[in-house]
Amino acid sequence: MPKKAKPAGSGKEEGPVPCKQMKVEAAGGPSALNFDSPSSLFESLISPIKTETFFKEFWEQKPLLIQRDDPALATYYGSLFKLTDLKSLCSRGMYYGRDVNVCRCVNGKKKVLNKDGKAHFLQLRKDFDQKRATIQLHQPQRFKDELWRIQEKLECYFGSLVGSNVYITPAGSQGLPPHYDDVEVFILQLEGEKHWRLYHPTVPLAREYSVEAEERIGRPVHEFMLKPGDLLYFPRGTIHQADTPAGLAHSTHVTISTYQNNSWGDFLLDTISGLVFDAAKEDVELRAGIPRQLLLQVESTTVATRRLSGFLRTLADRLEGTKEVLSSDMKKDFIMHRLPPYSAGDGAELSTPGGKLPRLDSVVRLQFKDHIVLTVLPDQDQSDEAQEKMVYIYHSLKNSREIHMMGNEEETESHGLRFPLSHLDALKQIWNSPAISVNDLKLTTDEEKESLVLSLWTECLIQVV
């Protein structure tokens, strides 16, 4: 494969071509990635592509393949997950369906070979060796610290949940049929080699997962081999399939995914209810009743459609004149379900406040800023119609890594604080300042100032400097 940068071809007459090929210099240090900040982590992950170039030319547009002749990076990638890691994980308690799937592609369809209950390494290895089955491990960041470290930083960078799956495929086999996903995908090749084929999307920026029949997808527009240390990105909706060629060692890769249900459409759905709620307080037309029997109509009437169109224009005008865009669910959902900050120790700094107790003469600063959201919502403790607005602060410091991206809604709870709307300006001061004197906070009394910072300090959200 060429070692110089080469743009992706169209894939029309000349056949499948690579997306983008780059050679990078070996990164220094034991991790081979830069964890100084979320942006530095992402920049090192896609190196040597520049972040600006990535978002201008590739993000949500087309695939990017970065092929690297870098032994240090290949070794680091290999440390993220190995086939042999399954043995120790099974001894900790892994269950079919929840934690691991065993499958293979047969005649263009996914055949699931799961057993019932607990997964045992010897059985997994038997299916892997004898049935040529792919082993898929769900959300390995729950168990592998370095993946936790990577994905936590990526969640800070994207402001969106970041999940992962490990796929281990034996030689001469394919685990999944051609399909497309509803997520932005970054693939890191960890062990062995894998043969990839990418096709034009039938549904660009798809909102759901779908299997596609071979006869529908045509010829691949990109075809290549991934080797340890290589990285592949493709947008949601990109049809793809991958196999481990016969005669080679098994392949292991991790798929890191993000931006599920994180579109402008999702954000509009999330914010429109808040806009209507506020507008209805001031506009009597929005409080007027709909025509009798409108809900019994098979189709909306012309009058109703015209009325709704007018309301939407009014809301659009109102939106342009305000800075208050209320996210009712997306902010809270993200913070509630994301990873807690990476901690190499016991995580005491996330649950026990440290340092000096903040006083009126203290200077304080926010910590774990990427793990906190501040939002204004109607008081959730009031059930009457005249709900007063409150300031809510949600954080992920106490989130459970063990259930990250596992859909355990009954085990998920929100962590945070609630303040009167009169505290909003003071909270914005803390958010927007590198450090600020407690005495300078925009609150009426000294007692309010001390009470505010003490509440934040108790939740480990600020520190005295």
From Swiss-Prot:
It comes from Pongo abelii. PANTHER family: MINA53 MYC INDUCED NUCLEAR ANTIGEN, RIBOSOMAL OXYGENASE 2. The gene is RIOX2. GO terms for molecular function: histone H3K36 demethylase activity; histone H3K4 demethylase activity; identical protein binding; metal ion binding; peptidyl-histidine dioxygenase activity. Its EC number is 1.14.11.79. This is Ribosomal oxygenase 2. Its cofactor is Fe(2+). The modification Phosphoserine is found at S309. GO terms for cellular component: nucleolus; nucleoplasm. Binds 1 Fe(2+) ion per subunit. InterPro entries: JmjC_dom, NO66-like, ROXA-like_wH. Residues 139-271 form the JmjC domain. It comes from the Eukaryota. Its main location: nucleus. The keyword Transcription applies. Oxygenase that can act as both a histone lysine demethylase and a ribosomal histidine hydroxylase. Is involved in the demethylation of trimethylated 'Lys-9' on histone H3 (H3K9me3), leading to an increase in ribosomal RNA expression. Also catalyzes the hydroxylation of 60S ribosomal protein L27a on 'His-39'. May play an important role in cell growth and survival. May be involved in ribosome biogenesis, most likely during the assembly process of pre-ribosomal particles. It catalyses: L-histidyl-[ribosomal protein uL15] + 2-oxoglutarate + O2 = (3S)-3-hydroxy-L-histidyl-[ribosomal protein uL15] + succinate + CO2; L-histidyl-[protein] + 2-oxoglutarate + O2 = (3S)-3-hydroxy-L-histidyl-[protein] + succinate + CO2. SUPFAM superfamilies: Clavaminate synthase-like (SSF51197). Keywords: Dioxygenase, Iron, Metal-binding, Nucleus, Oxidoreductase, Phosphoprotein, Ribosome biogenesis, Transcription, Transcription regulation. Belongs to the ROX family. MINA53 subfamily.
